[in-house]
């Protein structure tokens, strides 16, 4: 039997080769395939057995039951039913099981723990360093660096009920620096694609924002020249921050034709304030793909749900409001047992 260390080393190398497969990514304008990353965060996570191919048998199945290390080719097996849409991509896929989560287990709410590999809670001081998605965004830079979208809970958690706004997400830019996530497709499109908006009012607003930033940059720069010591350093930091936003806007303007071409075309229902959870996820996914395809970013993090998320719009139980926390504790919904509900969400 392989040692855990050797097995993990080979598995990670396999995952790395998957990420470098040219066919997975659209080429950019220079013909070079960019590396792109999507992180999906779920409140209840995935039970280990839901990732096991149903066609395992014999020795392999026995090793799986004993939680022993082994490797199989996915080409020789069928993916779990819920992963069926990815069957054509098994050649570029790795399912890596058995990693310990003890370093980031905190209880009911993980905050930045799972992507940061530390025990985070609601206190900013618990954020020890940047999460893995932000580290990758630094290694593979883009105009917007990183985008986070989330289906926030209607009560408590990061958003404190502001599910359609911009609130603390599940990623971190650095120590004590939580990232902010878009809570609805509507606000995400308004903010991310405002530079190519066809709406007259949005165009005016965008130009006003640009002029305000230009004025602020000039004012802060002039003020810094008259100061000394700590005060000068503070003002310079403000000035540098404003200039970084202006530089980002300049990059976005230079990409306007590509962004406009790949901007998401969503039905009106995705802009409603009372959007159901499933449609919210679909809307977020469309926006995430648009930003990746257009090259606005190379890293997207999508929080599909968290424990306080009240699910609506779920197939076969559309009229039910599903409490994800209760499902995690085994509570059935309608005629479906908790495990069946987990499969649906």
Describe the predicted segments one by one.
Residues 2-345:
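Ligand-binding pockets and gating/stacking loops
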